[in-house]
Curated annotation (Swiss-Prot):
Outcome recorded upon mutating K45A: Abolishes lethality
Catalytic residues identified in the record: D66 (proton acceptor)
Keyword Nucleotide-binding attached: yes
InterPro entries: P-loop_NTPase, PezT, Zeta_toxin_domain
Subunit-structure text: Forms a PezA(2)PezT(2) heterotetramer. The heterotetramer is much more stable than either of the proteins alone, and a specific mechanism may be necessary to liberate the toxin.
Gene from which this protein is expressed: pezT
One Gene Ontology term of the molecular function aspect: kinase activity
Induction: Conflicting data is available; found to be a member of the pezAT operon (upon ectopic expression in E.coli); in S.pneumoniae strain 0100993 is found in an operon with the 2 following genes (SP_1052 and SP_1053).
Name by which UniProt lists this protein: Toxin PezT
Length: 253
């Protein structure tokens, strides 16, 4: 058995624990809603977590694949062996956990917020279809953050984590970040054309909702294109200055 392998019983044990902790204090819904989340690394997707938690008065289960990586039975050994490259070896475990949780929790009709990047169209399309077949209203929420700002955030996050625990710090490869950014608009357009989402919303980091398909007739992809690659607002310029200052402070430590 390789170090990245895990047994079926180890996986089931972790799954049962996640089901218990994620549903604590939550109720199932007669008309469940599932929100798929998209945006590049460092864009600030947790902003949407907070908005939706408030909107649903806490009655929504957040499924975030990254949070399951550390549950891999050999996580510490993988960290020691591969350092920051260990993400490649925990990917399978975390992905399978997300899939299993979505299947189980949707059968129980909980409101769901499923974290993703929208790197491809296939995963959100498949997930949306599965949930629609189970009677869910499926929505898409995107966070639109200028690529320079999101990549800067990944660098800050890495340095902050590195100070706490060098083994656990996870750098985001720039090509991985840029790949998501460069496909975000096209993938949003494809998903819009498939018309599988009953609602598409676009948020910015300052928590403002800048697009809602229930109110806007324009294309979400066009709005996203402008927000990602168009003119910089004053707020964005200030965010960049603050971020660069923070990164320099961390690098000087």
């Amino acid at each position: 058995m390789e170090i990245q392998d895990y047994t079926d019983s180890e996986f089931k044990h972790a799954l049962a624990r996640n089901l218990r902790s994620l549903t604590r204090g939550k109720k199932s819904s007669k008309q469940p809603i599932a929100i798929l989340l998209g945006g590049q690394s460092g864009a600030g997707k947790t902003t949407i977590h907070r908005i939706k938690q408030k909107e649903f008065q806490g009655n929504i289960v957040i499924i975030d694949g990254d949070s399951f990586r550390s549950q891999h039975p050999h996580y510490l050994e993988l960290q020691q062996e591969y350092g920051k490259d260990s993400v490649e070896y925990t990917k399978d475990f975390a992905g399978k956990m997300v899939e299993s949780l979505v299947t189980k929790l949707s059968s129980l009709r909980y409101n769901l917020l499923i974290e993703g990047t929208l790197r491809t169209v296939d995963v959100p399309k498949k997930t949306a279809q599965l949930l629609k077949n189970k009677g869910y209203e499926v929505q898409l929420a995107l966070i639109a953050t200028k690529p320079e700002l999101s990549y800067l955030s990944t660098l800050i996050r890495y340095e902050e984590l590195y100070i706490i625990n060098p083994n656990q710090a996870r750098a985001t490869p720039k090509e991985h970040h840029d790949f998501i950014v460069n496909h975000l608009v096209d993938n949003t357009r494809k998903l819009e054309e498939l018309a599988i989402f009953e609602r598409i919303q676009i948020y910015q980091r300052d928590r403002s909702c800048v697009y809602d398909s229930k109110e806007n007739t324009t294309s979400a992809a066009d709005v996203l294109q402008e927000l990602l690659f168009g003119e910089w607002s004053q707020v964005e310029k200030e965010m960049l200055q603050v971020g660069e200052k923070r990164l320099n402070e961390l690098l000087e430590k």
